[in-house]
Amino acid sequence: MVRSFVENEVDPQALQYNREEKFNAGVFNRLGELGLLGVTVNPEYGGSGMDATAACIVHEELSAADPALCLVSCLAHSMLFVNNLDQNGSHEQRLKFLPPACEGTAIAGMCMSEPGAGTDVLGMTTKAVASSDGSSFKIDGAKMWITNGTVDGVTTGDVFLVYARTGPGRQDISMFLVEKARTSSKHSRRGTEGFKLGQKIEGKCGMRASMTAELVFDGVGRENLVGEENGALLCMMRNLEIERVTLAAMGLGIASRRCIEAMNAYGKERKAFGNPINTFGQMQKHIADSYAEYMAGKYYVYGVAADLDLSSAGNGLDADGTKLYCTTMAKNVADRAMQVLGGYGYCDEYQVERLWRDAKLLEIGGGTLEAHHKNMVRDLAKNVVTLP
């Protein structure tokens, strides 16, 4: 079902929306109709009730055609907000916010990075201070590089999970629901005072059909605190694993049907010196290495996903490992595809040019390569085990 949807509805629009740098609300709504925006969420709250493997399949298939759409809808919206709230929110919070997010009538995201804090997430300076009577918090600060922070360059997305410092300790972080005022046929809400768009981020190298922004905050109600005060670090760790494995699956999508299939088809058809170029050793190396690396990554990602428990944090080592391997693999495969296609690969009509640009973000967002190296060596040193 997902592959058919991608071929018929996602693929035809990808080039246009990349060129125009616009968010495709119509395809986003279709994802909601198909149950793909709440793929891991309990059906009680409007989701499809599936597992991490299903989430990886959706990310891989969508990224084969349009990684930017996947980033907007399945990664930022479905994993960073929807899955996060489903695992960490109260029944009342889930009942209020998840149905519109799952059906695609609200667009959501998560706010962690700041202008001065990215990989060092505990270095965030955005603060949430409780009022004297304890009924509300005042959030003061700004978040940067927020996917879905805007969908039109003028207004914000609908609702976000925002991490903010609530105590003096380095780990005293809490998570809050922050929303803009909105009215629809099914859902109306007042919104959070002091929540506004800072700036839309322009001129990105890739993922141009995903909208990225700075968001500014000032004031939020206590009922929008998610989980325990000063307890968001556990929420963060719990959701990082599925985020990283699905980002790795996006790398598989970039490498697979578009880049490897493009190399394979072009190598058979294009002739040089009287022979198909896939008869030359240099081209054979590009194609064969890419296929072998893709298959290795595929088994790694789906093996880890099969054992992933969405309700707990337990396999950070391999969540980091899949993303470390597959994101760099995707960039390298896209680079080889561009090399095999030559001048055609350098033009956006052949799509490998766009995938080449999109792939780079995967090595940065959701944890840099350097952060994965640090995390993995730390975990391996703590738990010296016999490798499988």
Indicate residue ranges for each PLM-predicted region:
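Alpha-helical interface subdomain recognition
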Residues: 1-65, 75, 88-93, 100-105, ...
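A short core secondary-structure module
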Residues: 135-136, 140-195
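FAD-binding core of FAD-dependent oxidoreductases
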Residues: 67-83, 102-117, 142-160
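Cytochrome P450 core scaffold surrounding the K-helix E-X-X-R motif
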Residues: 47-50, 119, 187-189, 226-230
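Flexible, small-/acidic-enriched active-site or ligand-binding loops
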Residues: 184-220
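A structural signal for short hydrophobic beta-strand segments in well-ordered beta-sheet cores
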Residues: 126-130
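Long, acidic (Asp/Glu-rich), low-complexity accessory segments flanking structured domains
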Residues: 215-235
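Short Gly/Pro-enriched turn/cap motifs at secondary-structure boundaries
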Residues: 116-119, 150-153, 165-167, 203-211
